[in-house]
Amino acid sequence: MRIFRPWRLRCPALHLPSLSVFSLRWKLPSLTTDETMCKSVTTDEWKKVFYEKMEEAKPADSWDLIIDPNLKHNVLSPGWKQYLELHASGRFHCSWCWHTWQSPYVVILFHMFLDRAQRAGSVRMRVFKQLCYECGTARLDESSMLEENIEGLVDNLITSLREQCYGERGGQYRIHVASRQDNRRHRGEFCEACQEGIVHWKPSEKLLEEEATTYTFSRAPSPTKSQDQTGSGWNFCSIPWCLFWATVLLLIIYLQFSFRSSV
């Protein structure tokens, strides 16, 4: 006689969908780290321009450009040299509230090292970021710098590199359009370079006049727009405005339903 054992019955397996299918997740925009921010600063454009110009300036040596978000000002390993670009121009884009602004106070730090025996050199680079003064978060947009501006900055880097690493007379440094007088107040509390104690340098009027006769600037400020309108304005796509329009829409729908029910 066979004994019936109910626990040995084999039921077909039930494949339940994972909870993630039914769960609603509110995903906040992730804050970008220093490494992500620095990698987004048109890394390919920087390397392309740097390699082309170094191949022309020093074809016998091999140079490499590395983005290093942990680079520190005046903290150098033995044999390394430093160049600090204090008056670069860049456009910032906030990934949280979509606010964009142009800044003439972008600071770029370079550390350089040349191994004469191996005929190889290395450049480490860090672009200091600025925080959005509307919501407090920011990242440097991939299209933050024009290719013409990058070429001018690389020219200054190579000039300093030839002076410090090769002992040559590099030539004259290029002054960019961002070095001109700007009446907008620079907010040091939102500037990463200012927070680390780097003092921004602004050239004298004489240097600006000399540079204006020898260098054609790629982009000039529009005369129709005031300087206060250039860096700020009404951002109707920001989160506060989105909440405002959503509230207005819900209020209109509520009034329509209440009016129909009363009729």
Swiss-Prot record:
One of its GO terms (molecular function) is zinc ion binding. Keywords: Cell membrane, Membrane, Metal-binding, Transmembrane, Transmembrane helix, Zinc, Zinc-finger. GO terms for biological process: detection of chemical stimulus involved in sensory perception of bitter taste; protein insertion into membrane; protein targeting to membrane. Expressed in testis. It is found in: Cell membrane. SMART domains: zf-3CxxC. It is a single-pass type III membrane protein. Residues 1-238 are cytoplasmic. It holds the Pfam family Zn_ribbon_3CxxC. The keyword Transmembrane helix applies. Interacts with olfactory receptors. Specifically promotes functional cell surface expression of olfactory receptors, but not of other GPCRs. This is Receptor-transporting protein 1.
